């Protein structure tokens, strides 16, 4: 069955990830493009669309097209909830870019709309589809590491602040590196541990390097006056079964321990980490061992105009679930928990107190 797709938001993540991936799937036609900058929509349509692809400035007009099966939401975070709910109510299946939403309440509205309409909803956590992630998930699912009681979610950059668009705008995005890249690392860690029941969260956020002049940023200097979100954030997460997760995220941090969209796991039978390729370690025959797993591991940067493998695998899995009426690989219920924890870290950082879950 051919799938007709509409794209809402034709910026960097659409052109770098969603569109090149969808364009490689034989059963997909990208038939509609929407952006408040109509020229961006026209350019995307010319590059990736069908011959008769339509362009819009108003996403509500796109949603009126009853021939569209699937909509991808590739807009700033503050728009995710309303656009997703409206798309679901317009009888479309929806892939929404990460994070699911700015707040737990918004994410819950999205989940409720999916259940109410019977349409499929997934969130763009493409790092689950990397080769190393898939391998490690098989390891944890088999129980090779035993009971995983400690995890670290890594999302640290030294100087890689996205200083374009609305990334530095608190009102539009809901936060900085925690909600931008910390969300990927936390999603991976929860997925590997298969644990979605937080009990308590404590967090800290910092506005330190963001308020200083800088010339070493990967994308050029930022303006401290425009930097309204945190430059780094850290969380301590206690799960209901006693397991503990430490989440570290930064766009700018004076640290050489730089890793992004990675996790480390410690279990009763062994441990694993993604910090130097993929390593599995433990104790055997009275000795300690470390196994280096050789895999083709690609990067996570979608701003160089190239499609990496995990983006294509994510798109294929998503389209397949729509065609075959199977659950999405990234379930909205899981993404909701990620949003709950991120929101709790921000709240704890603001109040100085722990946040407890029922």
Segments predicted by a language model, with ranges:
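Predominantly a Rossmann-like dinucleotide-binding segment in NAD(P)-dependent oxidoreductases
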Residues: 13, 127-227, 352
């Amino acid at each position: 069955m051919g799938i007709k797709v509409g794209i809402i938001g034709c910026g960097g993540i659409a052109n770098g990830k969603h569109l090149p991936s969808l364009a490689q799937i034989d059963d997909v036609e990208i038939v509609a493009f929407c952006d408040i900058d109509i020229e961006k929509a026209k350019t995307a349509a010319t590059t990736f669309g069908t011959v008769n692809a339509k362009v819009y400035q108003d996403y509500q007009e796109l949603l009126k097209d009853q021939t569209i099966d699937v909509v991808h939401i590739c807009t700033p975070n503050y728009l995710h909830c309303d656009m997703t709910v409206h798309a679901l109510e317009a009888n479309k299946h929806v892939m929404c870019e990460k994070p699911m939403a700015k707040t737990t309440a918004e994410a819950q509205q999205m989940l409720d709309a999916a259940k109410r309409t019977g349409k499929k909803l997934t969130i763009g956590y493409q790092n689950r589809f990397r080769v190393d992630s898939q391998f490690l998930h098989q390891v944890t699912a088999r129980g090779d590491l035993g009971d995983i009681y400690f995890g670290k979610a890594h999302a640290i950059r030294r100087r890689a602040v996205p200083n374009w668009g609305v990334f530095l705008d608190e009102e539009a995005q809901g936060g900085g590196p925690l909600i931008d890249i910390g969300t990927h690392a936390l999603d991976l860690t929860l997925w590997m541990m298969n644990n979605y029941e937080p009990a308590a969260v404590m967090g800290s956020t910092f506005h330190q390097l963001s308020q200083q002049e800088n010339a070493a940023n990967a994308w050029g200097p930022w303006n401290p006056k425009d930097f309204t979100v945190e430059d780094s954030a850290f969380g301590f997460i206690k799960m209901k079964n006693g397991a503990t997760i430490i989440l570290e995220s930064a766009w700018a941090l004076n640290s050489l321990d730089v890793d992004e969209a990675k996790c480390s796991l410690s279990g009763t039978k062994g441990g694993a980490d993604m910090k130097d390729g993929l390593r599995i370690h433990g104790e055997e025959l009275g000795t300690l061992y470390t196994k280096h797993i050789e895999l083709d591991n690609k990067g996570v940067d979608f701003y160089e105009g190239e499609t990496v493998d995990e983006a294509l695998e994510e798109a294929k899995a998503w389209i397949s679930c729509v065609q075959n009426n199977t659950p999405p690989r990234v379930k909205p219920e899981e993404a909701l928990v990620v949003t709950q924890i991120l929101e709790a870290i921000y709240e704890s950082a603001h109040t100085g107190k722990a946040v407890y879950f029922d």
